[in-house]
Amino acid sequence: MAIKVLVVDDSSFFRRRVSEIVNQDPELEVIATASNGAEAVKMAAELNPQVITMDIEMPVMDGITAVREIMAKCPTPILMFSSLTHDGAKATLDALDAGALDFLPKRFEDIATNKDDAILLLQQRVKALGRRRIFRPVVRPSTPTPTPRSSASSVLGGVSTHTQPAPAPVRSSHAASIRPSGKQYKLLLIGTSTGGPVALQKILTQFPANYPHPILLIQHMPAAFTPAFANRLNGLCKIEVKEAVNGDVLRPGCAYLAPGGMQMMVERTGVTGRVKVLAGSAEMNYKPCVDITFASASKAFGGDVLAVVLTGMGADGREGARMLKSAGATIWAQDEASCVVYGMPQAVASAGIATQSISLDNMAESILKESARG
């Protein structure tokens, strides 16, 4: 049966176009539309949609308030539409905090002109969120989307991704069963996409100010959003969190968030490292791209890396993680049950690259134990 969708927006044009696009996919069906948050709350309870697309700025009741009420009364996967502005970014992060699972930039021109990429992206996101029921606090997984058309190995060049021996199967673990390896690290990498903002906040807020290593964060996010996200994390965390700037020298206890619309790489400079922020190849689907950052870290730091792949659509991170593992690095993945979308972690785990599959609730403790100086 088709996934039932409720479309919520105060613009009649946007409601109509989103409905048309959703209904073009035989796996999706718009069952109703609403023009404000109050209508959305009522319809969510009465119609039991499997996915809701939600605008933020609406009369009567705004989207953020509607998300809070829906998640309290009848939890439903919600995809937010957000303007590409500083205020829009802050509001979107508030909506994610309230319980929304994902967001898309609200680009009227792309929607109006039937741009193929925009249509496919909207359909993929709605299907990804609608393929499972939502339970709180644990969210059930979805099916991953296809692999990006360009891998980091082809863009960076010179690093084989197929030279390692067949790895052992991934083990599903809880923090209590994870014993620190005693390995000495110089860098922590975390890559994520759908569901990442909430997951990163949950993990990083548990880190002490004296966390012993630099941290590179790669979150699929537009350029207008990453400054607001970095600022929000910095205000919530004991460690410092900043949007990465080209030339940043890596410091322990500091997390560097890859800027949206750019690629973040790292190079070795003596005992530490330095961030390189580049426009990157137009061939890459993702900017920032987890594969790009992971692959550069494999060259710069070799096996002295702990890399974690969190919830997200697609397979970004798999090839970069393969390079890291070939260099001797440790690779972990978020487990299926705690992912918003089990795509990126599944790609790493099913390829035998990840040595541990860890729940989000236990991830911070596990990282801290593994990272401890000993």
From Swiss-Prot:
Residues 138-155 have a biased composition (Low complexity). Coiled coil: none annotated. Its EC number is 3.1.1.61, 3.5.1.44. Keywords: Chemotaxis, Cytoplasm, Hydrolase, Phosphoprotein. GO terms for molecular function: phosphorelay response regulator activity; protein-glutamate methylesterase activity; protein-glutamine glutaminase activity. Residues 181-374 form the CheB-type methylesterase domain. Disulfide bonds: none annotated. Residues 4-121 form the Response regulatory domain. InterPro entries: CheB-like (IPR008248), CheB_C (IPR035909), CheY-like_superfamily (IPR011006), Sig_transdc_resp-reg_Me-estase (IPR000673), Sig_transdc_resp-reg_receiver (IPR001789). Belongs to the CheB family. NCBIfam families: PRK00742.1. This is Protein-glutamate methylesterase/protein-glutamine glutaminase 1. It comes from Shewanella sp. (strain MR-7). The lineage of its organism: Bacteria, Pseudomonadati, Pseudomonadota, Gammaproteobacteria, Alteromonadales. The gene is cheB1.
